A protein has these predicted regions:
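A short, amphipathic edge element
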Residues: 53-61, 87-88, 112-115
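Short aromatic loop motif centered on NTY/YTY
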Residues: 103-154
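Hydrophobic/aromatic beta-strand elements that line small-molecule binding cavities or substrate pockets
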Residues: 63-65, 91-95, 118-121, 142-144
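Structural motif
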Residues: 82-93, 137-145
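Beta-propeller domains
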Residues: 34-52, 84-103
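Terminal domain-start segments
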Residues: 1-60
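Short beta-strand elements that form the blades of beta-propeller/WD-repeat-like
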Residues: 70-86, 122-135
Length: 154
């Protein structure tokens, strides 16, 4: 497959590859809090070596990832922060998985908090992911369209 070795290690830690169609709810997302991503890899890739953050503060947990093998694009779904957070915001990043280079990202696309706010992620295809959040009796839906080059449109 010709993947950057360090980026491949990140993908292994992200868990099994998701295949569309796939539906993931808050309960499954919460289970990921039990398995954090290595802080060195999280700092380098998911936090993009943020100058305002120390490596030992780079907490991340995986929701999953997709690989569009036709265009060498990896789509990562995760949340940043400690597992004990009160609210979890979902971030999405796209990478060229052969080089490990970031293509695009969107932070805080959806969120959940125990029983007070629930989220559902529906992966229709490699190019369309729908997030539905229900909080305080209101439903919010966000559709992400991801081009074959990895660009994210909301």
């Amino acid at each position: 497959m010709g993947v950057n070795d360090e980026f491949m290690e990140l993908l292994i830690q992200m868990g099994p590859e998701m295949k569309p169609p796939k539906n993931i709810g808050s309960y499954v997302m919460e289970q990921a809090l039990e398995v954090p991503i290595d802080q060195k890899l999280a700092f380098k890739y998911l936090w993009q070596s943020n100058e305002y953050l120390k490596e030992e503060e780079a907490f991340c947990n995986s929701i999953g990832f997709l690989l569009n093998k036709e265009s060498s694009v990896a789509i990562l779904f995760f949340y940043k922060g400690q597992a004990e957070s009160l609210f979890y915001l979902i971030d999405v990043q796209t990478y060229n998985y052969k080089t490990g280079k970031l293509i695009d990202e969107i932070n805080g696309v959806a969120g959940f908090k125990g029983d007070d706010a629930v989220c559902n992620m529906q992966v229709n295809s490699y190019n369309e992911i729908v997030f539905k959040t229900l909080a305080a009796g209101q439903t919010n839906e966000i559709v992400l369209n991801i081009s074959n080059k990895g660009k994210i449109q909301r």
